From Swiss-Prot:
This is UPF0250 protein Sbal_3280. Gene3D superfamilies: 3.30.70.260. One of its GO terms (cellular component) is cytosol. PANTHER family: UPF0250 PROTEIN YBED. InterPro entries: UPF0250_YbeD-like, YbeD-like_sf.
Amino acid sequence: MLDTKFDELMDFPCAFPFKVVGEAHETLTDKVVAVVQKHAPGDYSPSTKTSSKGSYHSITIRVTVTSKDHIEILYTELAAIEGVRRVL
């Protein structure tokens, strides 16, 4: 797992925003929601912004997380989506 201190800084469960930056592709948002649904089923309405040149999408999604491990798993799996450049 990742070496983070989320467990020291946060009280769980809590809403946690993930920002996924990836290549502009029409299915990127659906892929992000699918990964989140796998680990935290719910009703999600992510916001999407397109870069000035249209090359990248930035998707922000708020997820109710239950532990440090839950956050780390989501970071790892979101980063593994094809075309994703960063997960913040």
